[in-house]
Amino acid sequence: MIIHPNFDPVAIHLGPLAVRWYGLMYLVGFIAAIVVGRIRLKLPHVAAQGWTAKDIDDMLFYGVLGTVLGGRLGYVLFYKAGFYLSHPLDVFKVWEGGMSFHGGFLGVTLAMVLFAWQRKRHWLQVTDFVAPMVPTGLAAGRLGNFINGELWGRVTDPGAPWAMLFPGAMRDDAAWLPKHPELVEKWHLADVFMQYQMLPRHPSQLYEIALEGVALFFVLFFFARKPRPMGAVSALFLIGYGLARFTVEFAREPDDFLGLLALGLSMGQWLSLPMIVAGIALMVWAYRRRRTAAAAA
């Protein structure tokens, strides 16, 4: 078993200001997105659409707003609506944490629609350009989660080579033991807990980096290197992220205030299913539209 390093969440102290790793990871993600975007500008079919470096900078501004506002509102509405209805001012306490990818995704989508309207472009043309830039940011965000030792995975077999002990999960581990006597006996978890006061868990943040970040980036980046029907790159992002998130959620610990929902699925899985369906529908529409246009030419 591997013990999580339990990093200091503060990366740098600048006088009274504490710069946290999680915030730095957001910065790294946005910088990586700019780099990927500028690489894409060199592709002939992208350059032919008239994209410029200034467009990337402007899209970044819209993207930051969409990510922060959408991510926060998504967390409030999807995960803890009851709490925030009773404590409305706590919505603004962003420093206490609480962001949702699915909310951030909706926020960025709306921001790109607004950007497209201002630039007189079709919004799918904008999202097709942006989609390959997103996974690097997702990977950076999940790395921030791992550094913070948060959003850990479900309890697993201590003999698994990937099993990791998370000091931040001690309280959850103690509460987990009496609820799962079969697994405690099967995996001899009582002995593990007596020795470490922790239980082995999946490092699900690393799984998400691998699937939602690295794998999705390469799939999108190489798919988008060739001209595709409008909407196809966006569709592949929806399908790819939805499948990656849905899969990883089987290893990720559900939010303790929600648990598992209908059919034994987590909130993250239920929010990912519409993305997959929408992505498939958009992909079919994109290629049918191109075939129709080619037949009419």
UniProtKB/Swiss-Prot annotation:
Main location: membrane
Gene Ontology cellular component terms for the protein in this record: plasma membrane
Location of the protein in the cell: Cell inner membrane
Biological process terms in GO annotation: lipoprotein biosynthetic process
Recorded superkingdom: Bacteria
Topology of the protein relative to the lipid bilayer: Multi-pass membrane protein
Role summary: Catalyzes the transfer of the diacylglyceryl group from phosphatidylglycerol to the sulfhydryl group of the N-terminal cysteine of a prolipoprotein, the first step in the formation of mature lipoproteins.
PANTHER family in alphabetical order: PHOSPHATIDYLGLYCEROL--PROLIPOPROTEIN DIACYLGLYCERYL TRANSFERASE (PTHR30589:SF0), PROLIPOPROTEIN DIACYLGLYCERYL TRANSFERASE (PTHR30589)
Protein name: Phosphatidylglycerol--prolipoprotein diacylglyceryl transferase
UniProt source species: Burkholderia multivorans (strain ATCC 17616 / 249)
